[in-house]
């Protein structure tokens, strides 16, 4: 089969293709050759991809709000010979918004995830658990860069090399990232909310949680957020976990919300009292209406136009 580069070269010689179009095609070919590409599906507000973990076929959920790669004990036991994890028994509990997860084994691992490299902690849980993949622990195979290009509208993310960053982030706004004690990315930003005649304004730290299907969760465990919520007197409704028969959070409707200089209208904001959650809340998937680039090496978040 004729290679794309040779085919484009022949077209240029025959003067059948404008130079700019040729450059575009070669650029797209270069991207395909250098990026580790993951195609996603959307299910119940979350994003999944079909990939491999050390050669084992697996359906994984995209995340940034977890402290490592997480999988069920059943999946691990079925594939442990291929996964090749050096596990240690654990009695750790991981706090989740709907309750605790019980950790059976832990490991520190470097694994092949599709064409990319995962490096970080692995938690093997007793409960039935979707495999959750923390994007901030993925690295490009050629230079180990932790750069993620994400476009939810195209159902795709890419693990990119360092030399791709400048082209990916032209005209993007830039936000600095810090990290929680568990390594989850955090952005510091002003937040302004208008809801039913009330107004909430705060500048604070928000965990970037790609496992959170909402636009935003506010954390009333933070004293400043709690005071603002009490003073604003917005009407809160309970959100139930039907499987456990418990109320795990609340929510309220907003007329207008601005965060990271991006504005959203007529949406819902969740409210939780999540003991131990750092910062003012969690920024979720519905925020990402634009392509974004995470540079986890240089601690930058780029919001593309």
Task: Please annotate each region the language model reported.
Residues 33-305:
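Pepsin/retropepsin-fold aspartyl endopeptidases
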């Amino acid at each position: 089969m004729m290679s794309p580069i040779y085919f484009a070269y022949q077209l240029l010689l025959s003067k059948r293709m404008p130079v700019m179009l040729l450059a575009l095609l070669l650029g797209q070919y270069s991207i395909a050759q250098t990026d580790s590409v993951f195609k996603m599906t959307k299910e119940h507000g979350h994003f999944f991809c079909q990939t491999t973990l050390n050669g084992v076929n697996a359906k994984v959920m995209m995340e940034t709000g977890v402290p490592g790669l997480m999988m069920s004990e059943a999946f691990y036991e079925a594939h442990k010979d291929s996964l090749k994890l050096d596990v240690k028994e654990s009695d750790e509990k991981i706090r989740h918004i709907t309750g605790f997860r019980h950790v059976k084994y832990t490991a520190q691992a470097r694994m092949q995830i599709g064409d990319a490299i995962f490096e970080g902690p692995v938690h093997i849980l007793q409960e039935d658990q979707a495999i959750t993949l923390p994007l901030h622990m993925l690295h490009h195979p050629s230079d180990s860069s932790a750069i993620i290009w994400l476009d939810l509208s195209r159902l795709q993310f890419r693990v990119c090399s360092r030399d791709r960053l400048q082209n990916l982030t032209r005209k993007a706004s830039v936000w600095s990232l810090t990290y929680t004690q568990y390594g989850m990315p955090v952005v510091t930003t002003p937040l302004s909310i208008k809801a039913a005649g009330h107004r909430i304004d705060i500048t604070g730290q928000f965990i970037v949680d790609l496992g959170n299907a909402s636009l935003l969760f506010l954390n009333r465990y933070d004293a400043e957020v709690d005071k603002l919520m009490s003073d604003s007197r917005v009407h809160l409704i309970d959100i139930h976990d039907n499987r456990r028969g418990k109320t795990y959070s609340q929510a309220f409707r907003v007329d207008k919300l601005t965060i990271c200089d991006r504005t959203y209208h007529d949406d819902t904001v969740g409210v939780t009292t999540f003991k131990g959650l750092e910062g003012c809340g969690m920024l979720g998937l519905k925020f990402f209406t634009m392509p974004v680039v995470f540079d986890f090496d240089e601690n930058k978040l780029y919001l593309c136009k």
